[in-house]
Amino acid sequence: MRKNTYAMRYVAGQPAERILPPGSFASIGQALPAGEPLSSEERIRILVWNIFKQQRAEWLSVLKNYGKDAHLVLLQEAQTTPELVQFATANYLAADQVPAFVLPQHPSGVMTLSAAHPVYCCPLREREPILRLAKSALVTVYPLPDTRLLMVVNVHAVNFSLGVDVYSKQLLPIGDQIAHHSGPVIMAGDFNTWSRPRMNALYRFAREMSLRQVRFTDDQRRRAFGRPLDFVFYRGLNVNEASVLVTRASDHNPLLVEFSPGKPEQ
């Protein structure tokens, strides 16, 4: 699916830019350009949300109230309507979307809004074998104030597949990117973990990548068959706060996490 895999970058006052996959992170990681840090503070706030193609009312007010103070907003099922693009470009320096499939008017897929321009951007797609619909993922990298580089992986995992072969296949190129990155990592999104084999595959992947799971005390995450679908994983950072916002603005509840880029937990 590589020929159909690209990201669209939206920046205020500029035409949308198409970005193709750059190739192996291993060959590029040592030569990334310098950039402005994602945050000048000692914390990084993120919002993670499957926005349900903005089909319900109040989605924009949720983003305005909870997203505008975040350094990163990781959306899944984000449809590039004029309202969403306007919000993104008015409040963030960059918005990168990977079109998973093109709807009649506006493409839908994962979209990462960021308070700094990424110094690396790698779009990924995987097709669901049953419905033939694609799901997308996006890997971006941002400088931190301490000169480290933060890798951010925004994931919407394949949903309809028999067994976990295709599910695990989607994680492989993500793992290749993470494995060649020595700095901190945030991997988050809708992982469609509605079965035990899927949960096991995701947890196994997280262990292999040395990623820890963010825990939510009042866990109001969307569930299917009793299992949560949305996750935030991380390494090389500390978790200061983590909460779930209960809303009717989507069929998923947004996850709010604050990290500090200081010395990570042992």
UniProtKB/Swiss-Prot annotation:
It is found in: Cytoplasm. GO terms for cellular component: cytoplasm. Keywords: Cytoplasm. InterPro entries: Endo/exonu/phosph_ase_sf, Endo/exonuclease/phosphatase, UPF0294. Its main location: cytoplasm. One of its GO terms (molecular function) is catalytic activity. Belongs to the UPF0294 family. This is UPF0294 protein YafD. It comes from Salmonella paratyphi C (strain RKS4594).
